[in-house]
Amino acid sequence: VTAFASLIGAGGAPRASIELGRGNFKKAERILGTSAAFLVAIALTLTVILQATKEPVLRAFGASDANIGYAVDFITIYLVGTVFVQLTLGLNNFISAQGKTTIAMTSVLIGTGTSIILDPVFIFVLGWGVKGAAVANVIAQLISSVWIILFLASGRSAIRLRPSNIRFNRVIVPILTLGLAPFIMQITECLINVVFNVGLQRYGGDDYVTSMTIITSLMQVVSVLTNGFQQGIQPIIGFNFGARRMDRVRQAIRVAFIAQITSATVLVSILAAFPSVFAAWFTSSPEVIGIVTRMMPVFVAGWGVFGIQMGAQCALVGMGQAKQSVFLAIFRKIIMLVPLALTLPHWIGVTGIFLAEPISDATSGIVAGILFYVTYRSLTRADDAKNR
């Protein structure tokens, strides 16, 4: 669900930023309206498909006979709010694209705060259990989506969500081409989780599956911060690229690389230094804590170099360079990580699954740096030629 929201939101918002930089407000508003139409259409389609296939999908992601009932109860209700999730995640990008980061942050806090308040009420006071958590989530996403739509439709928004623009048209093509990279990066997480779970179950057992879940959950915290940097810097890159202010583009790109590489290195270093402490947040099992303690430093070893790819991806999407962004997304996950996770365990056992991550991270970071350098030089030379 999140991946499809990124396909439209993370593809449309940078396109809108570029058009704003060019002073083309009408086209930016058409991009916004078209994105809203497709977000709703995709949400309705996903709701129908996932409701029909929820049990096999949940089992593919690791649900067992012991917890499948709870998972089905949650997802059945959660999917009712798919359209709200799509609109919240997808359209909030267009608020950030205007440089209104406080409003965008408020949109997130409204949903999070509502969920925090309603969760204990529905779960414990009303005794709805896991169903209560799902209901709270749907209500929270509904409130967030209404807040975002009201803002975008108001005069406070630099680009307005107008009913006349909410329709399907060919503007979707450049949106999809640019959104394909973040879509691939997120949708392949599903594939990676399946590959990891199957391999860990085969070569290690339940404790290794649990350990990987803990490690990836902690890495999500790192990803949230790095994605936050990306959402903050990307509109600046896009706007100035559209305005052909390459000096400001250069400054923003420098900040993007420094922020991504530094934050990735510092955060994963903390995780690698105190893995047992973080593991104890999730479990009291000494076996699982022991596995996390051994494997966390291995798993995160390549993230410092991977910060180069995050910086490059941020800059390339911000400048509307779809082909290069898509290649980098495919290279890391599909070309590198999946084959390594499938083959390394044959030679070195379960450790190979954890080792696949840093190898693919470091390799893709180096490739991304080279690709970005070549692309950026080409763009700056083309801009210099136009200015002569």
Question: Where are the predicted features?
Answer:
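Small-residue-rich hydrophobic transmembrane alpha-helices
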Residues: 1-48, 85-104, 211-275, 306-328
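Hydrophobic transmembrane alpha-helices of multi-pass small-molecule transporters
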Residues: 3, 115-120, 145-149, 220-224, ...
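Residue-level hotspots within pore-lining transmembrane alpha-helices
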Residues: 4-5, 45, 49, 79, ...
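Short runs within selected transmembrane alpha-helices of multi-pass transporters and secretion channels
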Residues: 9, 78-96, 104-115, 133-148, ...
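Hydrophobic/aromatic residues in alpha-helical transmembrane segments
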Residues: 12, 53-54, 91, 118-119, ...
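Short alpha-helical transmembrane segments in multi-pass integral membrane proteins
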Residues: 16-81, 125-180, 237-302, 343-388
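Transmembrane helical elements of multi-pass membrane transporters/channels
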Residues: 77, 111, 140-144, 148, ...
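Membrane-water interface regions at transmembrane-helix termini and the short interhelical loops
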Residues: 91-99, 119-128
